[in-house]
Amino acid sequence: MFRYIEKEARDSITAALEKLGIKVPPEIKLEEPPNPQLGDLASTVSFELAGKLRRAPIEITADIMSVIETPEIFETIESKGPYINFFVDYGRFSSRLLESIQDDYGSHPPRDERVILEHTSANPNGPLHIGHIRNAIIGDSLARILRMAGYDVETQYYVNDMGRQIAMIVWGLLNLDGDLEDYPGDKMDHRVGKLYFEVNQRLKENPGIRDEVDELIRKYEAGENEELFRKVVEYCLSGMEETMKRLHVHHDRFVWEGQFVRDGTVDRVIESLRKTGYTGENDVLYLDLEEFGLEKELVLTRSDGTSLYSTRDIAYHLQKSEEGDVIIDVLGSDHKLAAEQVGIAVELLGGKRPEVIFYEFITLPEGSMSTRRGVFISVDELMDEAHSRALHEVKKRRDLPDDVADDIAESIGNGAIRYYIARLSPEKHIVFRWDDALSFERGCASIQYAHARACKLLEKASFTGEEDIEDGWKPEGDERELVRLLARFPVVVEESALARRVHPVAQYAQDLANTFNSFYRSTPVIGSDFEGARLRLVDSVRKTLRNALNLLGIHAPETM
RNA sequence: GCCCUGAUAGUGUAGCGGAUAUCACGUAGGACUGCGGAUCCUAUUACCCGGGUUCAAGUCCCGGUCAGGGCACCA
């Protein structure tokens, strides 16, 4: 409906300009005025035309106003200075909007564009920690947004099963006492993390271990110890998957990088790169990208002939190029240089250059995290803490059976975490503080509460969905603002998908909840003259809040 | 040293070159609590510095300052 009123506004201006014999600019600019006294849409065409016509904007506006015809969806068109302001007829508009809102509100028709979206892809050398969480939450939310916007999306987790880090864990298994089960921790990924930490300690004391690890890598690329490597990775990954499941983060496919070495793809990639003429060789084979503005050459193979992460990544990206129309990667900004090198290499070989979404780091107040040094807060810890704090809040307010309270607490805890990350633009550096991440007084819990409140109201009124919208219903004030915001939701989805951004959805959910709460205070629903219309409105808010939260991977409980 | 990214109220944050800069927390008042108070209303305080482009700059360009990151035969 929002797009519809934009179109009506543009059409009316176009018609007016044609009537005046003025050449119509390619795009008629519209914006949303800063306050309701200035209407619902405003156009700045006169500013733009002023330069070309050598006339004052205000005069051009006056001319347009003299001939413009008001489309039926608008009540009036007025000029405020040089602006042309459109005022929506909220009686007509609101009814039409409510008729159009279904369960899947916000969804766009299929776009016939396949997106391969890689995210999380943390190394299986320990549990996910809060440094990884940003990748997972941005990636998963973006996948949901793209799907709602009509894209065909496949999410992939790229599993590093052959890097030095994994080889170190295998070394530990071969050389230290005890099997993985003997390491402390409830979850498999935590045990692997402990072992990894242990091996790092040994390595510090005895640098000679490094050669042994190199030997393991070499042998593995030649096909030895395959089961052992696989076992370690699967073991760790299964623990990580549990965590992601609890966070509501989903991947359609796990792609193991080792496959690209074993099936010869990496060798073929290296051969093809040689043929491009951009490679050079001393002890190692490298790619010289100076011509593309990158001073640092990209090393493709170690001196012992084994491959490197980036080399395998090139092979992986060529595969993704085959699978999708649009390739999106979510990466920490520390990968900027490497990603640029890989992107250029992929293009050299005729693949599609990925769009990369970079995010800045999450650090602890005392500094950065490190799996190697054992300094991190795991996502499991974070979620447990979120749950127990949320449970405390739930119990403080209401007396509920334990299992119900538990479910609600889980939704609220998860919501707090996901919202904490999703609401920020990715280029902001985050310093993690427990009380910021887990605040229930406001933030996500208040959005979930607005949803629960809507549910309760509908239940109380025995809402069926068949209620009629009364004649003469014409929203004003808070109610009008609520209608306006509802109409915007599909636009927010579309724009977020196009910009590959998640946080506008988070902001929108907050705005909608706030506006609904104000409306709830100021406007009676049950027993009012417009009970039918308002119940339909509340139901529409309910659906929209639920769908918006769902885009962020957050569950909206019906009671809390 | 070179490269990338940030800088907006006490704190955290949004902002397509356009009319009075968003939201949240905090603080201080207040409301109502008969559709659930995890509520509502009011007040409060901000675009790092210096140049430039433009009818119009928080937004674009150049130069500083501060902060984070990168510049591996790690990933």
From Swiss-Prot:
Gene Ontology, cellular component aspect: cytoplasm
Keyword Ligase attributed: yes
Subcellular location: Cytoplasm
Motif ('HIGH' region): 122-132
Any Pfam family the entry gives: Arg_tRNA_synt_N
UniProt main location, coarse: cytoplasm
Xref: Gene3D superfamilies: Arginyl tRNA synthetase N-terminal domain, HUPs, Isoleucyl-tRNA Synthetase, Domain 1
Class of this enzyme: ligase
UniProt keywords, alphabetically: Aminoacyl-tRNA synthetase, ATP-binding, Cytoplasm, Ligase, Nucleotide-binding, Protein biosynthesis
PROSITE patterns, per the entry: AA_TRNA_LIGASE_I
Top-rank taxon: Archaea
GO process terms (BP): arginyl-tRNA aminoacylation
InterPro entries: aa-tRNA-synth_I_CS (IPR001412), Arg-tRNA-ligase (IPR001278), Arg-tRNA-synth_N (IPR005148), Arg-tRNA-synth_N_sf (IPR036695), ArgRS_core (IPR035684), DALR_anticod-bd (IPR008909), Rossmann-like_a/b/a_fold (IPR014729), tRNAsynth_Ia_anticodon-bd (IPR009080)
Keyword flag Transmembrane: no
Catalytic activity: tRNA(Arg) + L-arginine + ATP = L-arginyl-tRNA(Arg) + AMP + diphosphate
MF annotations from Gene Ontology: arginine-tRNA ligase activity; ATP binding
EC number(s) per entry: 6.1.1.19
The family this protein is said to belong to: Belongs to the class-I aminoacyl-tRNA synthetase family.
NCBIfam families documented for this protein: argS
Protein name: Arginine--tRNA ligase
Organism of derivation: Methanothermobacter thermautotrophicus (strain ATCC 29096 / DSM 1053 / JCM 10044 / NBRC 100330 / Delta H) (Methanobacterium thermoautotrophicum)
